[in-house]
């Protein structure tokens, strides 16, 4: 079971609490986690990554074990602590403005 923490606006859209869980078999990567999340909560499609390219949206960041992994390859394996459910995979909305 992978634990995922979503930003407030996506929790509201998906009508979920602070943390959601996805069950995965095989390799655990950011791409696989996001795909499982979008399958479980279809209303999130296009909010985290682009519809056609499946690339991360510019103002969305991914964190694993306290590290920003947003610019890592999306098919890179996530840390064991995420895979074992000891730590959550964080999806954060970046703050921008002037």
What are these regions (language model features)?
Residues 1-97:
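Ubiquitin-like/PB1-type beta-grasp interaction modules and other compact soluble beta-rich domains
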């Amino acid at each position: 079971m992978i634990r995922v923490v979503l930003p407030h606006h996506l929790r509201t859209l998906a009508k979920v609490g602070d943390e959601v869980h996805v069950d995965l078999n095989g390799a655990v990567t950011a791409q696989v986690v996001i795909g499982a999340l979008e399958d479980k909560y279809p209303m999130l499609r296009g909010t985290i990554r682009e519809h056609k390219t499946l690339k991360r949206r510019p103002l969305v960041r991914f964190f694993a074990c306290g590290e920003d992994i947003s610019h890592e390859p999306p098919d890179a394996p996530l840390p064991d602590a995420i895979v074992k459910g000891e730590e959550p995979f964080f999806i954060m909305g970046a703050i921008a403005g002037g």
